[in-house]
Amino acid sequence: MRFVDTNILLYSISTQTAEAVKAAKAQAVLSNSNLALSVQVLQEFYVQSTRLSRPDPLTHDEALAFIRTWRRFVIQDITLAVLDHALAIKARYQLSYWDSAIIAAAKTANCTEVLSEDMNDGQDYGGVTVVNPFKP
């Protein structure tokens, strides 16, 4: 199973011409069924997609509609066990806490890959490998 980071969701809704190729790739990723997200990813999506300084902000209802659609994927809760695992990952790999929480949620959801533009492509974090789906 593959875990989807927030940036994939944000690119999938982009209407910016400069992001058209990434938007198409992100939409293709999300057309798969064998994906997982976390509550953190959905929260980050909501905050970033409705931010008024964004070139194409969504309304509350629009963002909510996307979030409801993505509930078809496995959604990993953020539990104390995920928090503990994230803190251990942060200490071991020197990642930001938020990236560590993504890796921990992916591992807890039995994912072998995290699809993300924001982390090191190809890096393995204890059995979870980062894959940049936008890399040529």
Task: Name each region found by the language model.
Residues 72-114:
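Active-site neighborhoods of divalent-metal-dependent phosphate/nucleic-acid chemistry enzymes
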